[in-house]
Amino acid sequence: KTTWMKRFNTSVNVAPSFLDKHLNFNFTAKYMFEKDRYAKVGDAIGNALSMDPTQPVYGNGEDYKYVGGYFQYLQNKSDQISDPDWKKMAASQVTQNPVAVLDNYKCIAKSNDISGNLEVDYKIHGFEDLHLHAAIGAQYTDGKQDETISKYSYSNNYFGYYGYDHAYKYSIEGKAFAEYAHQFGVHDIDIMAGAEQSHYHRTGYN
């Protein structure tokens, strides 16, 4: 009832050639967005299996306003609640209303993922056995999550709860090399020399 997932993807690829196909490019980029809503599915199922089926989803009476109008077995408020106008709360050690378990919890997560890669290959004019090749790739991922528990819930009655998490990470990798390949009769020679470097970073907070 309160879980879903939405996703959007797109990508592009371009591979042009120049100078009589001696200079070749290959560019690829991808983007993905995802949005999810999570629920306390296990808690809801467990309570649904043990809930008295003769009880209504919503309660009748003034006291049920302290639990959002849902039917719950009630008890007097705890000593931690000093508000004189708040008199009742959901009883502990008893089955909770499974609909209230779902409706009183909201967790929304969003993520963005962007990646790209560019490759360049140059075949030397007049000396086509020698190739110069370079490539660079990068990826960036950003994720956020908001968690809200209603003040009418069993777990956080009166006080409620709000939590926030945000994390992002990125990586960059690059390489460049020269390659010489030639066949001498029945013999092949292939020589390559180059360098490669990468960088990774991650940050998160709540």
State where each predicted segment sits.
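Surface-exposed loop/interface segments of Gram-negative outer-membrane beta-barrel transport/assembly proteins
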Residues: 15-115, 133-206
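Transmembrane beta-barrel architecture of outer membranes
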Residues: 5-11
